[in-house]
Amino acid sequence: MKTGIGLVKGQRKKEKTWTVSVEHGPKELRGVSIAVRGPVIVGRNPGADIVIGAGYVSGRHARFSLMGQNLFIEDLGSRNGTMVNGRPVMEPTALSNNDVVTVGDVAIRVRYA
């Protein structure tokens, strides 16, 4: 008899992940989607994880971060602010599936699936 580990088809649940997708903004970024597995910096600075060379975006504008299974957005002292569903972000803010985060004039859709 052999010893080993096997999976029975359909028994393992797919783990949910948070993704952020650019919906409105520079043409070259529209449709870009990334899975959030750690802190994600959004800004104009080339060292950012999502680099947006558009007006109204600061060098280090905002940060997506995970706390357990929850995703948060935090404004990093940007000049033009960050919004969630049209409301200004004043402190780290918990996000929900399908929320829209606005950084400058760029809209980023958040999904949990």
Residue ranges and their predicted role:
Residues 67-70:
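Short, conserved beta-turn/loop elements at beta-strand boundaries and strand-helix junctions
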Residues 32-34, 55, 74, 87, ...:
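Residue "hotspots" at secondary-structure boundaries inside conserved domains
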Residues 72-82:
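Short, basic/aromatic beta-hairpin or loop at an interaction surface
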Residues 1-53, 65, 102:
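Intrinsically disordered, low-complexity acidic Ser/Thr-rich regulatory segments
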Residues 83-113:
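C-terminal boundary/linker segments immediately following FHA domains
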Residues 57-59:
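Amphipathic hydrophobic-ligand
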